[in-house]
């Protein structure tokens, strides 16, 4: 009887432990997955400033290329894809928040014309779904800004080329949309940023000396990183500069350094880039009219040739008489 009670107690304990772990994982996962885009979403009403600069560049200081491909034109209420390319060397590893090395992640923000938005899942063709991967990774910048879509951070090895499933608006149902050429803006990054929105540095950037003087002591901290004591012999003051785990020191004890002189290397291997393109919302009636015009031109050419041959036959008959 005691063994049975003990077994029942053990089963309950295991089930409760597993349940707690699952709940903790669910709570923690969104904060990890959506940590980077949420910085911009919380701090800026619109990710594109009046100058054309995308706000992600405030945290990602290095410049890297990005590319975007879209159809030249689309019809109303049509699903199409925008292919965003964020190239980087897949062999390199970045400094993580804990100072260790890990894989590089990527992220992107796509600013579409008003009315354009993410395509509903049931409208996306099967072959496009295979290219997209997990549609849940895409999210609107704000509930009221469905034309601005963000994704990331996601693993760079799987998503250095991101396919956005989009749908065009219909001027027949949306009177604010017209058959025009529209701009599309892209911002894309690979790797972690160098500055947080509050202005503080991450551990993925260079650390500089706060004063000029002699490095009198370098203490390795228990949880990683360094405490660097710099003594200003002229003013007789001493300052301790803290370097978090991640960057590597390039100075040594006894060395005389200048103010703002780098104490560490630059661990950043990523960067941010902007791009833009254009897309035409095409009127189907215009295409139909164009086709009718081409058909009429071809028919006119055919009739002209037939008329010419008929005229030549009449001339030949008159000559034979």
From Swiss-Prot:
**Binding-site positions, heme:** 36, 56, 59-60
Per its UniProt record, what PROSITE patterns does this chain match? CYTF
Question: Keywords of this protein's UniProt record, alphabetized?
Answer: Chloroplast, Electron transport, Heme, Iron, Membrane, Metal-binding, Photosynthesis, Plastid, Signal, Thylakoid, Transmembrane, Transmembrane helix, Transport
Positions of disulphide bridges: none
Q: Does the keyword Lyase apply?
A: no
GO cellular component entries: chloroplast thylakoid membrane
Cofactor(s) it depends on: heme
What processes does the entry annotate via GO biological process terms?
photosynthesis
Chief localization class?
A: plastid
Signal peptide residue numbers: 1-35
Any transmembrane segments, and where? 287-306
Q: Which GO terms describe its molecular function?
A: electron transfer activity; heme binding; iron ion binding
Location of this chain's protein in the cell: Plastid, Chloroplast thylakoid membrane
Keyword check for Chloroplast: yes
Its domain of life reads Eukaryota
Q: What does the record say about its membrane topology?
A: Single-pass membrane protein
Q: How is the cofactor bound?
A: Binds 1 heme group covalently.
* Oligomeric and partner information: The 4 large subunits of the cytochrome b6-f complex are cytochrome b6, subunit IV (17 kDa polypeptide, petD), cytochrome f and the Rieske protein, while the 4 small subunits are PetG, PetL, PetM and PetN. The complex functions as a dimer.
User: Which HAMAP family does UniProt cross-reference here?
Assistant: Cytb6_f_cytF (MF_00610)
Q: What does this protein do?
A: Component of the cytochrome b6-f complex, which mediates electron transfer between photosystem II (PSII) and photosystem I (PSI), cyclic electron flow around PSI, and state transitions.
Similarity field: Belongs to the cytochrome f family.
User: Which protein, by its recorded name, is this?
Assistant: Cytochrome f
Q: Which organism is it from?
A: Psilotum nudum (Whisk fern)
Q: What is the lineage of its organism?
A: Eukaryota, Viridiplantae, Streptophyta, Embryophyta, Tracheophyta
């Amino acid at each position: 009887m005691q063994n049975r009670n003990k077994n029942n107690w053990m089963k309950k304990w295991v089930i409760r432990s597993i349940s707690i772990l699952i709940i903790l994982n669910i709570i923690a996962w969104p904060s990890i997955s959506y940590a980077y885009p949420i910085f911009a979403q919380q701090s800026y009403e619109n990710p594109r400033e009046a100058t054309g600069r995308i706000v992600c560049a405030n945290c990602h200081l290095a410049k890297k290329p990005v590319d975007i491909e879209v159809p030249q034109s689309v019809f109303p209420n049509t699903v199409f894809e925008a292919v965003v390319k964020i190239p980087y060397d897949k062999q390199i590893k970045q400094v993580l928040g804990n100072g260790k090395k890990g894989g590089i992640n990527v992220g992107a923000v796509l600013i579409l014309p008003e009315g354009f938005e993410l395509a509903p899942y049931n409208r996306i063709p099967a072959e496009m779904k295979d290219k997209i991967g997990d549609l849940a990774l895409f999210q609107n910048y704000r509930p009221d800004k469905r034309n601005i879509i963000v994704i990331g951070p996601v693993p760079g090895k799987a998503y250095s080329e991101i396919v956005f499933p989009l749908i065009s608006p219909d001027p027949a149902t949306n009177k604010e949309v017209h058959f025009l050429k529209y701009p599309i803006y892209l911002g894309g990054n690979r790797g972690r940023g160098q500055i947080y929105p509050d202005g503080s540095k991450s551990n993925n950037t260079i650390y500089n000396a706060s004063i000029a003087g002699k490095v009198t002591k370098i203490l390795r901290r228990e949880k990683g990183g360094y405490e660097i004591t710099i003594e200003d012999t002229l003013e007789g003051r001493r300052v301790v500069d803290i370097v978090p785990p991640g960057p590597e020191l390039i100075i040594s004890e006894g060395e005389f350094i200048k103010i703002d002189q780098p104490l560490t290397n630059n661990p950043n291997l990523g960067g941010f880039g902007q791009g833009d393109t254009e897309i035409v919302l095409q009127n189907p009636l215009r295409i139909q009219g164009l086709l009718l015009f081409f058909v009429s031109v071809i028919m006119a050419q055919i009739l002209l040739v037939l008329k010419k041959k008929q005229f030549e036959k009449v001339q030949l008959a008159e000559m034979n008489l």
